[in-house]
Design a protein with these regions (language model features):
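Membrane-embedded beta-strand positions in outer-membrane beta-barrel channels/transporters
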Residues: 115, 176-180, 224, 269, ...
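Periplasmic alpha-helical coiled-coil/stalk elements that build and connect Gram-negative outer-membrane
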Residues: 191, 207-325, 436, 440, ...
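A short glycine-centered flexible hinge/capping loop motif at secondary-structure junctions
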Residues: 255-259, 465-469, 506-510
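Bacterial N-terminal signal peptides that target proteins for export
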Residues: 10, 14-52
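Short flexible linkers and secondary-structure junctions
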Residues: 7, 64-219, 360-365, 388, ...
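Terminal intrinsically disordered/low-complexity segments used for targeting and assembly
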Residues: 3-6, 49-120, 175, 199, ...
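Sec/SRP-type N-terminal targeting helices
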Residues: 126-127, 143-144, 185-213, 263, ...
Length: 525
């Protein structure tokens, strides 16, 4: 149920009355003040009244104070706008497919192996899995409050006392065993709201595990792309250095023949050494990316060097991609799911706080045997039992309980703001990735033409220099242009694959809903 009427007039939150709770113990009407007394035959009106009140409390306990959670409405656009005209061949509004294993679309067996190995061995994933196990156990703890607690005990004792009249010592034995039970009846639903919050926390933790897997797959792929980029840049630098070494040799021959100056020779040497100097810096970046991959796979540095050094196919963006509509993306994104489940948990905790404003009801009892000898412990006359009902109600708390409700409502409002922020961030990231991917394709077309033209210009400049038709500066300029545009093309193609990785990450790729076997509840926005 929703809010129950408040049992007391509201006080301002800043009230300064002292805190206290009055515990009203209500013994059965037949009790003589001793727990082990039995009621006289035929006289159990107190027991009947207690049982009646218990049944009534159980009926009321079907209700729960506090707001009932409803998922917030989220206005998502009908389609993505970031693709633009250049991207219409890359994306569509058909349902996204293959998101769970998107890295296989790059057709690189080693990349697929690395991502799957990371998902199995990564320490961040292991930590998130442990966190999920923790909150599952905490939910069991929360749910245990709905049931009675039962315990068993046994004891034996011997006492010695001196009798003044006779001057003798008297020794007495006593033995006992029994069962004790206690139960706090969840009349106003505070415990059930706690279970509701704990269930939502389990679902949020499962979504956070999925978010960790999504981020991990993207990070492994990004570092793998960077490894291949650094390797490509090293090849480009070495190829250009080889070409520039030939130019230096040609210039030296021409200088010996009196057709070139010493200045031309030194300029050619400078150009060559500058290109060679790029290689160590690129190798440093390559090693860093390899080491990062090894850390993501929980491996020691150097474990993957041999495999990553083997030739591999060039990574390329598929000719056509499919992305779902924005609403599908919001349902797929685990971080959005986690934020929504956190909101549900904080909403349930408002009911927990409100339940503290109302009385609490407890039942306790014991059943056992007591005897002066072990031989008679299990005889029919050794049985003892007791039952006790209690009620505790808050009277003066200085506004603390109401302040706790207000504080929890503020926590709920924070969770709502975080959820809305997660939704907007998800939409932003997809749009940015689509724009980057679209523009990258357009840039790639121009760069391919630029590389072809630069190589042709370099060949013509060398031929004309050999024929003595141009000075050496023309050769230097075309050499530098070739190196620059080839590096730019390699970087742009890597950027295209990285944009694809970011797109799949922003779409929530890298996990399957239900893979953690967690109930989804109202997880959909």
């Amino acid at each position: 149920m929703g809010h129950l009427p408040d049992p007391r007039p509201r006080r301002p939150i800043n009230s300064h009355s002292p805190d206290s709770r009055e515990l009203l113990r209500v013994p059965p009407a037949w009790s003589t003040g001793r727990d082990l007394d039995r009621p006289p035959a035929g006289r159990t009106p107190g027991l009947r009244a207690l049982l009646s009140s218990t049944v009534a409390a159980l009926c009321v306990s079907a209700c729960a104070v506090g707001p009932d959670y409803r998922p917030p409405e989220t206005a998502a656009p009908n389609a993505w706008t970031g693709a633009g005209e250049q991207g219409t061949r890359l994306v569509s509004d058909a349902p996204a497919t293959g998101l769970a294993t998107w890295w296989t679309s790059l057709d690189d067996p080693l990349l697929t192996e690395l991502v799957e190995a990371a998902l199995a061995a990564n320490l961040d994933v292991a930590s998130a899995q442990a966190r999920l196990r923790q909150v599952r156990a905490q939910r069991v703890v929360a749910a245990s409050g709905l049931y009675p607690a039962l315990g068993a005990s046994a004891d034996g004792r011997r006492a010695n006392a001196s009798v003044e009249t006779s001057g003798r010592n008297v020794t007495a034995d006593a033995y006992g065993a029994g069962l004790d039970a206690s139960w706090e009846i969840d009349v106003f639903g505070g415990t059930r709201r706690g279970v509701e919050a704990a269930t939502a926390e389990v679902q949020a933790s499962a979504a956070q595990l999925a978010a960790t897997q999504v981020s991990l797959a993207a990070e492994v792929a990004s570092n793998y792309v960077d490894v291949r980029l650094q390797q490509a840049l090293i090849r480009i630098a070495r190829d250009n250095a080889a070409s520039q070494a030939e130019t230096l040799q040609l210039t030296e021959w021409r200088a010996q023949a009196g057709l070139a100056s010493v200045q031309d020779v030194e300029q050619a040497r400078t150009n060559l050494e500058r290109t060679r100097a790029q290689v160590p810096a690129l190798e440093t970046s390559l090693a860093a990316s390899e080491h990062r991959l090894e850390t993501l796979l929980a491996l020691t540095p150097g474990s993957l060097h041999e495999r990553l050094s083997a030739p591999a196919p060039a990574l390329a963006v598929p000719a056509r991609l499919t992305v779902g509509i924005p609403a599908d993306t919001l349902r797929q994104r685990p971080d959005v799911r986690a934020a929504e489940r956190t909101l549900a948990a904080e909403t349930a905790r408002i009911g927990q706080a409100e339940a503290a404003l109302y009385p609490s009801f407890t039942l306790s009892g014991s059943l056992g045997v007591e005897s002066l000898t072990l031989g008679t412990l299990m005889s029919g006359d050794s049985g003892v039992w007791s039952i006790l009902g209690g009620i505790a109600a808050p009277l003066f708390e200085g506004g603390a309980l109401r302040a706790q409700v207000a504080a929890q409502e503020s926590v709920r409002d924070q969770a709502l703001a975080e959820y809305r922020k997660a939704v907007l961030t998800a939409l932003e990231e997809v749009e940015n990735a689509l724009v980057a991917l679209s523009n990258n394709q357009a840039r790639d077309t121009s760069l391919v033409t630029a590389v072809e033209s630069a190589r042709l210009a370099d060949t013509l400049a060398r031929e004309r220099y050999t024929a003595g038709l141009v000075d050496f500066q023309s050769v230097l300029d075309t050499d530098r242009t070739v190196l620059t545009v080839e590096e730019t093309l390699a970087q742009n193609r890597a950027d295209g694959v990285l944009a694809l990785v970011r797109l799949y990450k922003s779409l929530g790729g890298g996990w399957s809903p239900g893979a953690n076997n967690e109930p989804q509840g109202d997880a959909e926005p």
